[in-house]
């Protein structure tokens, strides 16, 4: 009876370990994916704690193996990323392609690699924290927005803390203002 009991307990332990290891492997595999994820109504900005979907304009996210950090604006994400300790993280950065989205509610189906995006800085459009850096996959879309709403087109590597501070000061405390009337699309034709 003891031998039978030990065999049953040993078998049960082996089965539990097998399921446990399989479960760990699956969980690890999901976390290793560095693909963008959708924004949800309950998501809060990693920097300021605001509900992300309550505000217009492009958003950002940093996807790591340990999880996803979401941001209410591209400016918030870029400001976070430019901190020296964050640049050491193995994270992939994403922003909305505003060439394929409406300003009031960017489409999560069009999240692009932030490091290869074109950014329009100094537009009249406002995002969650006032200053907005409109993000685009295509340079011609960025130039079209700059032509309609002002600003200049920059690449990811041209953005630094001084530029983000300059963009914020241009908004004159426009924090949480929504896009002006008629600014429904990031640019005409999309």
UniProtKB/Swiss-Prot annotation:
- Where are the residues of the annotated region Disordered? 170-190
What is the name attached to this protein's record? Copper-binding lipoprotein NosL
Pfam families in the record: NosL
Residues annotated for lipidation of the kind N-palmitoyl cysteine are 24
Q: Where is the composition biased (Low complexity)?
A: 180-190
Gene3D superfamilies for this protein: 3.30.70.2050, 3.30.70.2060
The uppermost taxa in this organism's lineage are:
Bacteria, Pseudomonadati, Pseudomonadota, Gammaproteobacteria, Pseudomonadales
Q: Which residues form a coiled coil?
A: none
Report membrane topology: Lipid-anchor
Q: Which gene encodes it?
A: nosL
Lipid sites, type S-diacylglycerol cysteine: 24
Q: Which residues form the signal peptide?
A: 1-23
Q: What's an example of a GO molecular-function annotation for this chain?
A: metal ion binding
Q: What family is this protein classified in?
A: Belongs to the NosL family.
Q: Where in the cell is it found?
A: Cell membrane
The entry's keywords: Cell membrane, Chaperone, Copper, Lipoprotein, Membrane, Metal-binding, Palmitate, Signal
- Report the protein's function: May act as a metallochaperone involved in nitrous oxide reductase assembly. Specifically binds Cu(+).
**Family annotation (SUPFAM superfamilies):** NosL/MerB-like
Q: What induces it?
A: Induced in response to denitrifying conditions. Activation requires NosR and DnrD regulators.
Q: Name one GO cellular component term.
A: plasma membrane
| InterPro entries xref list | N2O_reductase_NosL
Subunit annotation: Monomer.
């Amino acid at each position: 009876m003891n031998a039978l009991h030990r065999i049953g307990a040993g078998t049960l332990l082996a089965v539990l370990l097998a399921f446990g290891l399989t479960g760990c492997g699956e969980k690890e595999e999901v976390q290793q994916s560095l693909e963008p994820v959708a924004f949800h109504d309950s998501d809060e900005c990693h920097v300021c704690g605001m509900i992300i979907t309550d505000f217009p304009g492009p958003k950002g996210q940093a996807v790591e193996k340990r999880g996803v950090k979401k941001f209410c604006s591209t400016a918030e994400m870029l400001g976070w990323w430019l901190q020296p300790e964050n640049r050491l993280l193995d994270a992939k950065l994403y922003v909305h392609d505003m060439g394929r989205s409406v300003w009031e509610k960017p489409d999560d189906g069009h999240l692009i690699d932030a490091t290869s995006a074109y950014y329009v800085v100094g537009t009249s459009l406002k995002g969650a924290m006032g200053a907005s850096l409109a993000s685009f996959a295509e340079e011609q879309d960025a130039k079209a927005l700059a032509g309609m709403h002002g600003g200049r087109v920059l690449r990811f590597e041209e953005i630094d803390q001084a530029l983000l501070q300059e963009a914020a000061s241009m908004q004159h405390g426009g924090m949480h203002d929504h896009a002006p009337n008629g600014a429904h699309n990031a640019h005409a034709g999309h």
